[in-house]
């Protein structure tokens, strides 16, 4: 029987008491009485089979029975009473109780989501040698909305099958929001010029993705940039006249065609994505006031012009029963103007580099009565490999600040500014965001680093965890000598240029240590693979 601290669970449950392990050598049965829980039963059974276990019909002699029970049913009452576990009102929306003891397992939830999350924890309790770690767990999330965003406009555009795998994976670690970032890669039938053929999400793809995600209790939040970041639209002559500057990046607020274009896009989005949120972006409108609206900005100021157009967007869209998210740049640029915003907007404050000092990003919105989410980042863009030496403290600090100040959600971001980033190296940061969003208070980085390899890769040797630490150290080493981490800029820098020669002189001093860290990581991963295959 493992001690509590040795169980590699991500996220960590709020309350966990150890019980004797259960032997699974004679099979496992999974039963669900509620129709809404039958997919969870199927998903759990599939996961157990993938672990090499035998899934048998309920009532099979000697098999460990898993019962998915709703709160208030006889099975739930019996399990809670036997474990002397109580049910708190905070657990109702997504919480669960798990009792794995005396040859049986009962997962209790007041909702389908709660039962599903209990089943995800049960998957992680299955250890080697066909054993299940016995435990009594009570658990529920700190934040209502726990998400990850993937930039599908500026880097590799994922296939529908890959996005489904992303959904399955984030759901397994109790994330419930998957946000897709669109500049020009959502296909609008009314605007066929915009989306690249074969490199965009079609309406049929969107419907399939939404339906698939719903089974895993994941809400798809579409983000269509509606103000800035629109060069791939405005580069076309048909739309160029709507730009603040010729073929630029920002819509001109004063152009009579700007708002109708946005309304048309979001009418299509409204028919494809039925969830409670849509995201209008509206960040980094750097060109605003440098072109057609310069006289207006000179007269009224940049903040009022920006906020007036954002308010017009919100008023024009205002879908019944849905909330509009927007990026919270204005808290930095014009905090005194925030009170002019419609109060039903949700401000998503973002910062990808700091480890503390987040209150000024949230307070202007909270003081104005707006709901807030926080958006840290995995720091995998513009880099050969994510800079987790920066990302982990950023995710840790920002989500903890959001919890403390009353934010209702966290959206951990993965960007592709350079067009070269791949998503797979981001899972380390994504899972830490899942832990920080579900667990109350400040997530422990060291604890996460100790758990990741076993929880995500199935490596119980610690080799994967140590490999990640070596790569963190490599980034920190490059930062310490002023080279800014393993950036694409450094990778592609011409070594014969004056700047390249300067960087090379600095690099030579740390190159042996840097290469050893990378070589260590390669050897450690190879060791983990060898142990797993053996």
Region spans (language model):
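Sec-dependent N-terminal signal peptides
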Residues: 1-5
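Feature activates predominantly on carbohydrate-active enzymes
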Residues: 87-316, 325, 374-376, 380-382, ...
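Contiguous, structured surface segment used for ligand recognition
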Residues: 6-146, 397, 420
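Substrate-binding groove of N-acetylhexosamine-processing glycoside hydrolases
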Residues: 9-12, 16-18, 23-26, 91, ...
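Short strand-loop junctions, especially beta-strand C-caps/beta-turns
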Residues: 27, 33-35, 151-153, 183, ...
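Generic recognition of short, well-ordered alpha-helical segments
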Residues: 39, 43, 161-162, 359-360, ...
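Beta-rich nucleic-acid/ligand-interaction surfaces
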Residues: 61-62, 186-189, 193-195, 335, ...
């Amino acid at each position: 029987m493992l001690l509590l601290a040795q169980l590699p669970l991500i996220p960590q449950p709020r309350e966990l008491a150890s019980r004797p392990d259960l032997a699974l050598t004679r099979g496992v049965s999974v039963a669900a009485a509620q129709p809404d829980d039958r997919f969870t039963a199927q998903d759990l059974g599939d996961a157990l089979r993938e672990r090499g276990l035998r899934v048998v019909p309920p009532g099979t002699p000697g098999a460990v029975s898993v019962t998915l029970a709703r709160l208030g049913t006889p099975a739930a009452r019996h399990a809670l009473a036997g474990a002397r576990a109580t049910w708190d009102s905070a657990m109702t929306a997504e919480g669960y109780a798990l009792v794995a003891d005396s040859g049986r397992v009962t997962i209790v939830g007041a909702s389908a989501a709660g039962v599903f999350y209990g089943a995800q924890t049960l998957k992680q309790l299955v250890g080697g040698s066909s054993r299940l770690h016995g435990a009594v767990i009570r658990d529920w999330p700190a934040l209502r909305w726990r998400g990850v965003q993937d930039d599908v406009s500026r880097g590799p555009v994922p296939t529908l099958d890959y996005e489904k795998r992303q959904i399955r994976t984030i759901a397994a670690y109790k994330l419930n929001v998957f946000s897709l970032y669109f500049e020009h890669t959502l296909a609008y039938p009314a605007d066929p010029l915009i989306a690249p053929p074969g490199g965009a999400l079609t309406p049929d793809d969107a419907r399939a993705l939404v339906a698939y995600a719903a089974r895993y209790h994941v809400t798809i939040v579409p983000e269509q940039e509606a103000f800035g970041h629109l060069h791939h639209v405005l580069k076309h002559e048909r739309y160029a006249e709507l730009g603040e500057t010729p073929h630029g990046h920002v819509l001109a607020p004063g152009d009579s065609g700007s708002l109708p274009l946005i309304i048309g896009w979001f009418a299509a989005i409204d028919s494809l994505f039925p969830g409670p949120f849509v995201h209008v972006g509206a960040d980094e409108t750097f060109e605003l006031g440098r072109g057609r609206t310069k006289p207006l900005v000179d007269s009224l100021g940049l903040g009022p012009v920006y906020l007036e157009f954002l308010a017009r967007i919100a008023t024009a869209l205002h879908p019944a029963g849905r909330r509009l998210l927007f990026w919270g740049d204005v808290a930095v640029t014009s905090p005194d103007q925030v009170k002019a915003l419609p109060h039903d907007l949700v401000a998503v404050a973002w910062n990808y580099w700091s480890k503390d000092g987040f209150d000024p990003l949230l307070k202007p919105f909270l003081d104005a009565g707006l709901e807030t989410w926080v958006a840290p980042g995995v720091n995998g863009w513009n880099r050969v490999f994510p800079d987790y030496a920066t990302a982990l403290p950023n995710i840790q600090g920002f989500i903890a600040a959001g919890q403390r100040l009353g934010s209702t959600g966290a959206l951990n971001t993965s960007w592709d500014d350079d067009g070269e980033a791949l998503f797979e190296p981001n899972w380390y940061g994504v899972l830490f965001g899942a832990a920080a969003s579900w667990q109350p208070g400040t997530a422990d980085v060291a604890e996460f680093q100790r758990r990741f390899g076993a929880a995500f890769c199935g490596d119980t040797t610690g080799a994967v965890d140590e490999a990640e630490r070596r790569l963190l150290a490599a980034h920190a080493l490059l930062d310490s000598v002023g080279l800014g981490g393993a950036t694409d800029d450094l990778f592609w820098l011409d070594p014969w240029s004056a700047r390249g020669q300067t960087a090379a002189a600095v690099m030579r001093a740390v190159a042996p240590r840097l290469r050893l860290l990378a070589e260590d990581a390669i050897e450690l991963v190879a060791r983990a693979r060898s142990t797993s295959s053996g």
